[in-house]
Amino acid sequence: MDFKNANELLTLCEEKNLPVSEVMRIREIELGETSAEIVNEKMTRVLEIMKDAAFSPIKQPVKSMGGLIGGEARKLSLHAQEKKGLCGDLLQKAITYAMATLETNASMGLIVASPTAGSAGIVPGLMLAMQEHYHFSDEKIIQALFNASAIGYLAMRNATVAGAVGGCQAEVGVASAMAASAAVELMGGSPKECTFAASTVLMNMLGLVYDPVGGLVEYPCQNRNAAGVANAIIAAEMALAGIPQLIPLDEMIQTMFTVGKKLPAELRETAMGGCATTPSACEACHMCS
């Protein structure tokens, strides 16, 4: 069982009467010539790593290697405990876990690139927040991760997830699309609604540049992971409400790729434009001088 694009994925889902997650899981088993047990064990390990990367910085903040971030997730957690937050429980936890994961990455901790290190907080941020908020089992979250991986696979096969090629839209944008699709399936949405959510996300983040201060995956990457997880919730909610997406996911992936290639090199991970060249950023980071 294999698919090259979202249209083929939806056809398989309809023909086999399966959710996106199960089509992707079977694909991994068949193409990897392995067993269901091994594939499930690997995804179980993925979830374990995600949990540790998201929870550890909240308990014990660590400064990043570049010194630009560290402790933000704990501040968000404490703020939530004071009951003064603007966000509801789900979004508050999601942005906290997303930012925490970036702290783990920036301090040389173990993370799951989903699909990249710079966007690694979005999928676990939303999945772990939904698990706590809705009391989903690990098995349900693991299944949702297979759904997310299907969207990531489509972006990698037909476009890019590299910021150096497509800008931050290809990293944070794709990660947000993965999370949105997984969230839709978790809440009982259809395969088509999953692709609607993913397409909406990419549309909302189209053209986002990659401008890491000092060339480090710290700032503004951490903030954008928080924005990405919020974007995923918005897109998933719209899809679940029955709002269709005019532009299919396959077309949106191609559009993202086209726009990314048109971005100047200064805005594609070179730290030569955008936030990276502001006076305040350069003053804060000795690597900019």
Where are these regions (language model features)?
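Alpha-helix capping and helix-loop boundary segments enriched in small/acidic/polar residues
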Residues: 85, 114-117, 139, 163-171, ...
